[in-house]
Amino acid sequence: MTETGELPSDLAGMQRYVDAWIRERGRYWTPLSQFARLAEEVGELGRELNFRFGDKPRAAKDEPGSVTDELGDIFFIVLLLANDLKIDLAGALAATVQKYGQRAGS
């Protein structure tokens, strides 16, 4: 993929991969800047979903976007933010799934 090698398929490996990638190219942005970028990307995803499935027609000047690309952008920034804040996303996801499972069982 890049000089960092192939993208791992496990979440912890993805976090390490993105950490190596960002360090090769510079540094992490501040957490607040990362959050602002995340909000921007979520907005772009929302815009594309609204064009595709909502009531807002796409204007002639609006190029079709890619839901896949927008989700990839969001995931990349989530990985960056988690790394910067020293959060194990696999552990966070496991806790969230357990929490939702308990809610569904109630």
Short names for language-model regions:
Residues 1-71, 75-106:
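Flexible "arm" and connector segments at domain edges
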